[in-house]
Every structure is written in structure tokens, then in C-alpha cells.
Amino acid sequence: YIIFTKCPADLTESDKELYRNRSAYYSTAPVLFTYLEYGGIQDQFGNAIDPNLPIALVTAIADDSAIRTYLNQHYDVNKVIGFKDHHNFQASDIAPLMAESKAGKIQIVCTEKDQVKLLPILKGQPLFTLPVEHRFSAADQKLLLDDLRGLLSS
């Protein structure tokens, strides 16, 4: 299989066909597409984000454009601090944000990947994460599952 990930959820059939045609030069494998589906933002204690407070996004991922776009469409993002992928966070990186968060002025949001590295620094302060999953279209999911079932029953 050739799987194009992080596609727009509304990728048109004509756009998919363009990708399939270009891929055909290199492989006859079936071409599938995934899109990102975001879950509800929660902190490490299970509390939902306050929709009335602005958020500060902190990331250390290769390309944070999708999460930025999503958050800007749905929330009041008043700060974005982006670091290089695999950044080794230090308390000094986010000290001003921690002070604003403690004062109840902002909520710090990050990816699930970055949460692992940021939680020890925040020392019990709320840190919100935006869960994300890759999803196949119903047709692509059926094709993949049918093929897998066929392989497993052989």
C-alpha cells in the first residue's frame, strides 16, 4: 500500500485521482489516504479546557501547521511557541507561560508527544493536550480491513 497521511479531511476525489496517477509511475500498490481527527482538549487530570480563556500553544514537532490551523479555527490562540522537532525542554523555555498559566490568564496546550517532556517541568500545573488520530475514509478503511482479513484467513 501507498498511504498518504495528514491529507485534508475534505480531499476531493479528483485530487485523490491525481495522487493515484502520480503514484502509478512508481508502484501498482493500492493508494489510500488518511486525515487527522482531533479529540477534545484535556489536561493531565482529565479536566476540559476553559473555552473562555485564551491558549498558548507549545510544540516541538517537525511541522505544527495542522495543529496551529485547527486551534486557530476553534479557540482563541494568543501565543504560539514552536521549537525544533525533538527539542529537549527546559523550564526557562516556558517560564513566562507558566507564570501566566498559574495566574489564570492562559492555558498551555501541546501535543501528546510534547506532554511527556513538559509535564515534569510544569510540576503539577495544568497542561492541556490535543489528542490526534489518523483516520481512513470509510471506503479506504474497508479495503484495508478486507485485505488484512483475507491475509489472516489464508
Where are these regions (language model features)?
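Short glycine-rich, flexible loops that bind phosphorylated cofactors or substrates
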Residues: L11, V116-L118
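A short, gly/pro- and small-residue-rich
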Residues: R20-S23, Y75, L118-F136
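C-terminal accessory "lid"/substrate-recognition subdomains
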Residues: Y1-Q107
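Short, polar loop motifs at secondary-structure junctions
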Residues: D64, E112-V116
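Short conserved micro-motifs at the rims of enzyme active sites and ligand-binding pockets
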Residues: Y70, P120-I121, Q141
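Residues that form generic nucleotide/phosphate-binding pockets
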Residues: R22, E100, I121, D147, ...
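Short, flexible loop segments at boundaries between secondary-structure elements
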Residues: K84-N88, Q125-S154
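Conserved active-site loop/cleft motifs that coordinate metal ions or position small ligands
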Residues: Q107-E112, F128-P131
